[in-house]
Amino acid sequence: MGAYKYLEELQRKKQSDVLRFLQRVRVWEYRQKNVIHRAARPTRPDKARRLGYKAKQGFVIYRVRVRRGNRKRPVPKGATYGKPTNQGVNELKYQRSLRATAEERVGRRAANLRVLNSYWVNQDSTYKYFEVILVDPQHKAIRRDARYNWICDPVHKHREARGLTATGKKSRGINKGHKFNNTKAGRRKTWKRQNTLSLWRYRK
């Protein structure tokens, strides 16, 4: 087994003594740092490489913490001015994952970079910590790499804000196979197509 396989097995057993100790030390370290900060190297190199990271120029890792829990509706004094069914303020569940939120915040901070992917690294009672893989679209090492230069195209600006990263697509229910027939073109698009009566007019 290669070194990365051992790292992978360590991560699978998150309740093991080794990993519990490591995570406790690391989470203390992360709490002392800024909400969004650049990491020198990935905490989980095996996971980062599986998601497309390469230890070469043009690739950057940012670590970010996101507060856990529900999303409170931003209304003044809790006044929603609606029917009782829509008056909820506190117990509403955000429809996107915290990982998607983390990607979006990092994407706003490093607006000149492109978000490639992200992964979970740690959590405590208050926060979840993620590492986001970013790519510099202006760097020659990226522009000349046939595997990665697709992300230099302008249509990939702020992929994370439009639900085009892996976690964004998961939130949108977009994937392949028979389980995803009802979200193939998007949940709302499919609903509209299936609930719109279209009567074709034929002339003889």
Swiss-Prot record:
GO cellular component term of the entry, any: cytosolic large ribosomal subunit
Keyword field: Cytoplasm, Ribonucleoprotein, Ribosomal protein
Q: Which GO terms describe its biological process?
A: cytoplasmic translation
Biased composition range(s): Basic residues: 169-185
Where is this chain's protein located in or outside the cell? Cytoplasm
Any idea which GO molecular function terms this record carries? RNA binding; structural constituent of ribosome
Span-the-membrane segments of this chain are none
Sum up the protein's function in the record's words: Component of the ribosome, a large ribonucleoprotein complex responsible for the synthesis of proteins in the cell. The small ribosomal subunit (SSU) binds messenger RNAs (mRNAs) and translates the encoded message by selecting cognate aminoacyl-transfer RNA (tRNA) molecules. The large subunit (LSU) contains the ribosomal catalytic site termed the peptidyl transferase center (PTC), which catalyzes the formation of peptide bonds, thereby polymerizing the amino acids delivered by tRNAs into a polypeptide chain.
Q: What's the miscellaneous note?
A: There are 2 genes for eL15 in yeast.
Complexes and interactors: Component of the large ribosomal subunit (LSU). Mature yeast ribosomes consist of a small (40S) and a large (60S) subunit. The 40S small subunit contains 1 molecule of ribosomal RNA (18S rRNA) and 33 different proteins (encoded by 57 genes). The large 60S subunit contains 3 rRNA molecules (25S, 5.8S and 5S rRNA) and 46 different proteins (encoded by 81 genes).
Protein name, entry field: Large ribosomal subunit protein eL15A
Q: Which organism is it from?
A: Saccharomyces cerevisiae (strain ATCC 204508 / S288c)
Name of the encoding gene: RPL15A
